[in-house]
Amino acid sequence: MYHTQGSRTTELAQAALDGARGVEETETTLKRAFDTTADDLLAADAILFGTPENFGYMSGALKDLFDRTFYACENKVNGKPYAVFVCAGNDGSGAVFNIDRICTGLKLKKACEPVVARKVNTPEQVEAARELGATLAAGIAFGIF
């Protein structure tokens, strides 16, 4: 799930989706943060969170998702793998840190290092997002996570 008001985060979300869909043993869904519910999080085998960096933090919409779903998911998603991608105007560290902190509270398990695209999406960063999606899906398909 992701949020964006521009094209950069959408580009990375689509790349991650393409990577995940390359793993035939899994079913992948792409949802916007505002359209995601606690039931979606509970039903997922893994979760990939994507956001722009806004003022050194995650987007308000992604924070809203956590606010709306935290207590419904608390102690029900323990150990579920997650990963993060961030489109950053700065270094993305604030967004990553705070997403990780909330995910720690949910007892989610960090499966991969974050992908942070700084300033503009380079072909390498788009490929990194594709690989992130593929890695998360393959980890689920083959019981690694």
Regions found by a protein language model. Give the residues of each.
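Glycine-rich phosphate/pyrophosphate-binding loop and the adjoining helix
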Residues: V23, T37, K109-F145
